[in-house]
Amino acid sequence: MTCRPVVFEPLEWLYVMRLATRLLPELSFHRDEAAAGVAASLGGISIDSLRDFDWSNPVVYMPPFERLASGSVVVAVEGYTARKLERRNVRADVVVSDLDFEPDGVWLGRSAVVHVHGDNYWRVPRGPWVYTVQSWPRGCAFNISGFTDGDRAVYLAYYMGAKEITISGFYPNIVLKRNDVVKRKKLSLASLLIKRVALRVPVGFI
């Protein structure tokens, strides 16, 4: 399968990054170009491989999820969530992660979308994954907008053609990894970005 870099919606990406850089100046946005270079060198697979799944009614599971839902494709946000689903006899079709929350869990999914950015690019390994970046992509890497793993998974579902998206476990007031100012600001941004996607396609929460 031929692989070329794609920015799915350049204007949306620019909007998202403008918000993120204003809200989270403490992050290493100045290293995102270097991260894109690393992503290009990792030999990832094409995002078109994900089109083998039926994206009509995806269910996106966030780390705090409790309830299962029926849908056409199972998307786990973070390796932690993929492992949590496995304990309930559900296998994730797609794991979306920047490998900072039980990274080994990404191997539990049928496929993975791994995000490479300025704060993690030196520790992202080579794998049979779709690599995403938050700058202009090169090589076999992609920009699907979004900023946190959670809202990026929702953008992915939308760009893959979802007619309706179900989200299980998105509770911005519940923090599992760490409870600090940066994490709370990220969750606030994720909430705003998911609402933006919900203006384009129905999004339900359980």
Q: Language model features by range: what are they?
A:
Residues 160-179:
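Glycine-rich phosphate/pyrophosphate-binding loops
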Residues 73, 79-162:
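Acidic/Gly/His-enriched mid-domain segments of enzyme catalytic cores or analogous surface patches
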